[in-house]
C-alpha cells in the first residue's frame, strides 16, 4: 500500500465521519485530462468494491487516493516538430525567425500535438491517523506529496497541514539508534548512508552489513553524519528513515500472512489498511517520545542530500555485501 511515506501534522479539524470525508472528496473528484490540459488531478474511490465512497475509515485510519493524469509530450518530439515548422517559416518568409516568433510557433506546435499525445496516470495513497492527527502520504517525492495536501485543502476548504517536525531533529534519533542508544522499539537494521561534514560532502552507503561493526561505527567518528538509517520497528515493519523524517523502503513483516488468512477483496483491503495504519501510528508515537512533540519553532534540519553540492556531483562510496 505504502512504500514511501511523508508525514504532515494537522492543526485544523478533520471530518468526523467516513461519509462526511467521502462527500467532501467527491466534490474534488478526478476528471480526465482535456485535449489541451497537461495534468488533471482529483480524488477517486480507494476501494474498487465501494465505488460510491471516496474514503474508507478502518480502525481509526482514513484511506484516500489521489489520481493524476498526465499528457506525455516528450520534449524531443516537440523540438523536432518545431524545427520542421521553423524551416517552413524560413522558406516562406526568407528570413530567420526572431525570438518572439519562435516562442509563438512553439506554442502553436504544442497546442497541435498535445491532443494527440498518450496519457498516463499516477495514483497516490494517503492515510490520516486520527489518534495522532497526522497525515501520511505515500510518496517519496516532496512535490507529489504536496500535491495531495493541496487537493485535500481544496476539497476540505480549510486544512492547516505542515511537514511533520518535532522538538529535536530527526538526525539526533538516527545517531542514537546507530550507536545503540535509541528507543527500544527501533532496532538497528543493515543499511545506512553517511555524509561528510567537510565541504566536499562525499557520501558512504553501507548495505547488507552489520552496522554495529566497529568499521561502520567509525564512520560517525570520522567527521561524518547520518542521512539515512535502516531500522526495524519491533516485529511489525522495517524501513529506512532519513534526517528529514521521510520513511522509505517500508515493508510490513506480517502482511503476507495476513493476506493469506483473509477472504474477500474488501476484507483484505481493510486488513491492510488497519495494519499499515497501526504500524504508522506506533512509529509516530515512538518518534514523538524520542524527540518531543511538535514545536512551534522546530530546529532547522540539515540540508537534504539532493540539495548538497549544487553545480557539482559529490563523491560517493557504496559498500554492499551479499
Where are these regions (language model features)?
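Intrinsically disordered, low-complexity, charge-rich terminal extensions
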Residues: 1-322
Amino acid at each position: 500500500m505504502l512504500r514511501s511515506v511523508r508525514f504532515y501534522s494537522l492543526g485544523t479539524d478533520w471530518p468526523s465521519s467516513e461519509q462526511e470525508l467521502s462527500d467532501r472528496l467527491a466534490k474534488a473528484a478526478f476528471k480526465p485530462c482535456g485535449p489541451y490540459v497537461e495534468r488533471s488531478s482529483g480524488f477517486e474511490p480507494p476501494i474498487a468494491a465501494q465505488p460510491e465512497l471516496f474514503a474508507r475509515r478502518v480502525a481509526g485510519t482514513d484511506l484516500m487516493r489521489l489520481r493524476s493524469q498526465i499528457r506525455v509530450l516528450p520534449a524531443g518530439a516537440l523540438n523536432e516538430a518545431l524545427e520542421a515548422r521553423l524551416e517552413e517559416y524560413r522558406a516562406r518568409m526568407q528570413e530567420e525567425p526572431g525570438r518572439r516568433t519562435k516562442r509563438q510557433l512553439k506554442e502553436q506546435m504544442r497546442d497541435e500535438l498535445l491532443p494527440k499525445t498518450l496519457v498516463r496516470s499516477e495514483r497516490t495513497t494517503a492515510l490520516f491517523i486520527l489518534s495522532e492527527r497526522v497525515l501520511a502520504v505515500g510518496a517519496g517525492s516532496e512535490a507529489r506529496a504536496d500535491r495531495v495536501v493541496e487537493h485535500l485543502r481544496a476539497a476540505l476548504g480549510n486544512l492547516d497541514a505542515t511537514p511533520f517536525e518535532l522538538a529535536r531533529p530527526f538526525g539526533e534519533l538516527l545517531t542514537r539508534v546507530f550507536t545503540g542508544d535509541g528507543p527500544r522499539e527501533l532496532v538497528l537494521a543493515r543499511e545506512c548512508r553517511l555524509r561528510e561534514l567537510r565541504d566536499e560532502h562525499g557520501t558512504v552507503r553501507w548495505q547488507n552489513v552489520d552496522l554495529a561493526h566497529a568499521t561502520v561505527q567509525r564512520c560517525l567518528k570520522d567527521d561524518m553524519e547520518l542521512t539515512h538509517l535502516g531500522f526495524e520497528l519491533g516485529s511489525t515493519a522495517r524501513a529506512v528513515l532519513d534526517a528529514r523524517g521521510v520513511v522509505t523502503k517500508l515493508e510490513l513483516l506480517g502482511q503476507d500472512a495476513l493476506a493469506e488468512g483473509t477472504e474477500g477483496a474488501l476484507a483484505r483491503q481493510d486488513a491492510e489498511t488497519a495494519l499499515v495504519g497501526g504500524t504508522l501510528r506506533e512509529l509516530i508515537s515512538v518518534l514523538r517520545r524520542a524527540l518531543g512533540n511538535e514545536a512551534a519553532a522546530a530546529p532547522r534540519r540539515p540540508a537534504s542530500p539532493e540539495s548538497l553540492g549544487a553545480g557539482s556531483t559529490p563523491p560517493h562510496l557504496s559498500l554492499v555485501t551479499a
